[in-house]
């Protein structure tokens, strides 16, 4: 069996070496996501024979990432066979997730008609043109511009944007604690945010917040694992302050995403309100 070890901060360089070679437009290949969510998903990794193997699950149900090598070298079929053997040794089926089209074709070529493929709609990433989110030009985004213009008019001189620093990190986390208290389904995200904030410099994470009359009304965290894409890991705002979500989205993108082509706002997890919001862009 493969000798999997729990993911820790010390695995950052190893994960980056394998997973940042190519943008697969799936946030689960982001080293930041792998590390900050490791505790929630019980993520483990193993490097063997030039491949990095990653598995997540509680021991009863485990999900494997496709084995990745440096420069697509090595025996991919043999690497997948190791996953199959590992799963079968535990009496499980081998379930491989986060396949892009290239990896799906590679897997099917190596194992014709052996795997059944299903779309994971709730886990699909929302990828946007970066300049579109920065400028909000066009008819589709007219409503977003209106929300921002109303916010700027209503709160002129009363709001300010701050980058995440050691000086405001506790305020940032306190806001998210208060926000998450209203919805238990975001407790796991709170744990991930705690890891991200405690190690934001080491992990290369950028953050931003908006204050209104000195009080935080919106926060966000993101990172850039690939040359052409920025990933937004966390975004929260006050529902009772119209325009706050649109403001934090645009303000952060303006300051951090000018030099990338895409912005990945991750998945909606099947949450109706989140899906509606992300589709609206």
What do the predicted segments below correspond to?
Residues 206-281:
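Aromatic (often tryptophan-rich) hydrophobic motifs at membrane interfaces
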Residues 27-102, 211-240:
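Conserved donor-binding loop and adjoining core beta-sheet/short helix segment
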Residues 95-96, 160-162, 262-265:
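Short catalytic-loop micro-motif centered on adjacent basic/acidic residues
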Residues 111-184:
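Acyltransferase donor/substrate-recognition loop-hinge adjacent to the catalytic core
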Residues 103-117, 269-281:
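Conserved active-site alpha-helix within GNAT-family acetyltransferase domains
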Residues 15, 151, 278:
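A residue-level signal for conserved active-site and pocket-lining positions in enzyme catalytic cores
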Residues 166-231:
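A mid-sequence, solvent-exposed acidic-amphipathic segment
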Residues 1-49, 184-189:
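Amide-forming acyltransferase catalytic core, primarily the GNAT-like/NAT-type
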């Amino acid at each position: 069996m493969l000798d999997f070890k729990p993911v820790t901060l010390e695995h950052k360089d190893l994960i980056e070496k394998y997973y940042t070679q190519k943008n697969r437009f799936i946030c689960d290949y982001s080293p930041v996501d792998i590390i900050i969510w490791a505790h929630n998903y019980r993520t483990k990794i193993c490097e063997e024979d030039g491949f990095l193997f990653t598995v997540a699950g509680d021991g009863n149900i485990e999900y494997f990432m496709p084995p990745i090598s440096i420069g697509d070298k090595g025996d991919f079929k043999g690497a997948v066979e190791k996953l199959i053997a590992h799963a079968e040794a535990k009496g499980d089926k081998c379930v491989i997730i986060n396949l892009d089209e290239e990896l799906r074709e590679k897997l099917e070529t190596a194992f014709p008609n052996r795997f059944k493929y299903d779309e994971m709609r709730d886990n699909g990433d929302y990828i946007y043109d970066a300049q579109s989110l920065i400028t909000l030009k066009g008819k589709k985004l007219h409503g977003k511009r209106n929300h921002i213009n109303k916010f700027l008019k209503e709160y002129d001189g009363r709001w300010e944007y701050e980058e995440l620093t050691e000086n405001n990190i506790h305020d940032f986390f306190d806001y998210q604690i208060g926000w998450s208290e209203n919805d238990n389904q975001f407790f796991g995200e709170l744990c991930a945010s705690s890891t991200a904030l405690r190690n934001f410099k080491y992990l290369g994470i950028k953050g931003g917040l908006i204050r209104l009359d000195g009080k935080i009304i919106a926060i966000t965290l993101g990172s850039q694992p690939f040359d052409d894409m920025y990933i937004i890991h966390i975004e929260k705002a006050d529902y009772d302050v119209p325009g706050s979500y649109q403001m934090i989205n645009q303000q952060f993108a303006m300051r951090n995403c000018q030099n990338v082509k895409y912005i990945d706002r991750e998945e909606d997890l099947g949450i109706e309100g989140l899906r509606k919001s992300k589709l609206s862009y």
